[in-house]
Amino acid sequence: MKLKETLNLGKTAFPMRAGLPNKEPQWQKQWDEANIYAKRQELNANKPAFFLHDGPPYANGNIHVGHALNKISKDIIIRSKSMSGFRAPYIPGWDTHGLPIEQVLAKKGVKRKEIDLADYLDMCRQYALSQVDKQRQDFKRLGVSGDWENPYITLVPKYEAAQIRVFGAMADKGYIYHGAKPVYWSWSSESALAEAEIEYHDIDSTSLYYANRVKDGKDILDTDTYIVVWTTTPFTITASRGLTVGPDIDYVVVKPANDERKFLVAQALLSELAERFAWDNPQVLATHKGIELDRIVTIHPWDDNVEELVMNGDHVTLDSGTGIVHTAPGFGEDDYNVGVKYGLDVVVTVNERGIMMENAGPDFEGQFYDKVLPTVKEKLGDLLLASEVITHSYPFDWRTKKPIIWRAVPQWFASVSKFRQDILDEIDKVHFYPAWGKTRLYNMIRDRGDWVISRQRAWGVPLPIFYAEDGTAIMTKEVTDHIANLFEEHGSVIWWQREAKDLLPEGFTHPGSPNGEFTKENDIMDVWFDSGSSWNGVLNTREDLGYPADLYLEGSDQYRGWFNSSLITSVAVNGHAPYKSVLSQGFVLDGKGEKMSKSKGNIISPNDVAKQYGAEILRLWVASVDTDSDVRVSMEILGQVSETYRKIRNTLRFLIANTTDFNPYINKIAFEDLRSVDKYMLIKFNQLVSVINRAYSHYDFMTIYKAVVNFVTVDLSAFYLDFAKDVVYIEAADDLARRQMQTVFYEILVNITKLLTPILPHTSEEIWSYLEHEEEAFVQLAEMPEAQEFANQDEILDTWSAFMSLRDQAQKALEEARNAKIIGKSLEAHLTVYASEEVKTLLTALDSNIAQLLIVSQLTVTQEQAPKNALVFEDVAFSVEHARGHVCDRCRRIDETVKERPYHVTICNHCAAIVENHFPEAVRQGFESK
């Protein structure tokens, strides 16, 4: 027979090469056929519930890597909770209304105003559902488990009805009102926008310094005085109706030597402004507090028929400009607020498409608002003192990527101010990951204005508001409940298919309509009201869910989006937050830390990653990054993650291969009967179990990743498995030491597979298929291991921790010997340990084959004084010489007993004894020659 046939060389069909791109879809098909998600829910039916509510992605296009980060993170949490004693259903959702879908149809040549509205809305609906199907397949390809056949979709009639009921409850409490306040207006979308629908970019703008002449100085200023104003939006001068000063700011009247006019500016800015305007030796004639200037009257710079009132406002600062700002109540929130206080007219001179209207004056009418600068300069004439280009942050429509303006238009609002404190109180009760999220959301709610909820579009949920003949808005509970029931039965499209009187409850009357005539609102709801109602449309209506949710998890942009809108509607209707905890994640950037974009060519597609590396690599990447801040990804980074995956896989493959002849019901050794080193490894592993379980409960995936990688590479590969072959390969199959080590192998293999399942479900399932003694058909149906406590574990850990330090010192001695050409491999070494009493006691306490642990052929422990050439440490020294004897062909150790026998001359006595006791045919026939 061959010598290697006497070895227990681990064999397994578990492949080294994962082949993930091909294997993952096969596993996913098995899971679908076996209905694993439903079985897990059945197993946990009577367990405590955990509800992670899915924030709905927008149904348009394939998923991007940000979607992957989000959905994989949720999947890791749901899987870990499901395996840890919780009923944790996952209902994926989609946001399906809104402008992007209208834009897609427009690009396809669909002209909304030229076809029947019901037909147009059906086209929107069909497109949205096609995108839901596309994204559903993308998410399933990532291994995300959930009730994919029963998702929630915001265009479904039952969901739309739930949304109307939220609106109705808010209206019933007086939180819905109509007003003409300035709102973010997107001329490119022809619609109002919510705060969550804007993004900021740095742009260059031309700012102007100009002057208004005083008409009535109220005995404070002379009529030959000019008040100097600064603006960054020249087009709004067409609607300017006042000037605002700071009440506590000091202002000075100055007379430059080179100008006949007198000017008023902020005292603190005089020096800077004099230089900018080239004023020669400006003489200060008077000083006034802003409060003294209240209600002084000035003349509009080019329209003598328009008077502009000087007002006081706390929003005026000395950061830039002149300390005085012009005020156009139709084009700014601060302008509007101070204008209302002083009774100014709200004038809007720009239409919905950004075109200057007739009331802007004949010189401006028909021009695009952003192109009027030359006309403004011409109209200002010698009242224009200076202009300069500045770079500043400016709001853009997040969908069209075009700049927006503030514009006062009649809109429907949801009040926040009426119950703001209630919202803030609820935020204090929510747990945030990371903790700074609480402050961020708190400040956003504290500082935000009321919510403009109306949109001038078609594809969305109609505002269920009627108007009486006298213009009175009707949104009583009776009416909104009736509309909700109609929507639930027919869908919201019925709003457009029926006349107002046919939508109202039968026999409905109103004192404002003596003739029984009614009209209906044509605006739709902000899509953030759609998704912000999901706590009612999903959590509150599905039998398998509950409200409030345990967790909302989304990107950090959702503090002004879904976290925000959901909180407002939930507190408005029910008085409490829709979530107990909020977890936010940073954005996904490319490998250089730059934003991904098609133009840069740096987009990483999850589908491409799945094809090249497999979804497991993307999932492992998610676990490896700190999502509290922005994260980076590139194919190079994923390649590094793939290498880490390979190390984990091959380490676990070694454990599989070396437990194929191990039956835990027959061969398992009790803890108290294990060798000390085996006890140590089990204790170390259970520390890992504890760390991982705690990290899962805190959604701390990176800690899990680091802990697993460290255990696999340091504790297993670099130590325990490094000397394991000397036991599991060399000793007899049923040798006690081998069974002891296999006990540890198997315990680690089974439980680390369970621990990794939430992150690497495909790989874990593949490993599980080789564990024939485990009762669950799929590892996803197993339970997470719980950390065990062992007798004397602290003492064992202390002892082995001391040995690991000694081992590091010994390896330095072996490395020096290797560099000096005394040895090649460590098995060629005879290591002498010059031990102090403390070290000798330690080595005795280990009760182990120290030479085997250090992977040397021969070891001597002595308390003699170390020679001069020894490597000396504080309480121990080492010397290394080449081992004496010959290499054993079987165990590869150098041993002086090799060649001592008349037969089996190439192996040592220890190996010979094993062969003679277990392979009698080798004794009779000898070994085949190499």
From Swiss-Prot:
**Subcellular locations according to the entry:** Cytoplasm
Cofactor binding note of this UniProt entry? Binds 1 zinc ion per subunit.
Pfam families under this entry? Answer: Anticodon_1, tRNA-synt_1, zf-FPG_IleRS
| SUPFAM superfamilies on file | Anticodon-binding domain of a subclass of class I aminoacyl-tRNA synthetases, Nucleotidylyl transferase, ValRS/IleRS/LeuRS editing domain
Which residues does the annotation say bind L-isoleucyl-5'-AMP? 554
The domain of life for this entry's organism is: Bacteria
Family, similarity comment: Belongs to the class-I aminoacyl-tRNA synthetase family. IleS type 1 subfamily.
Identify this protein by name.
Isoleucine--tRNA ligase
Native species: Streptococcus mutans serotype c (strain ATCC 700610 / UA159)
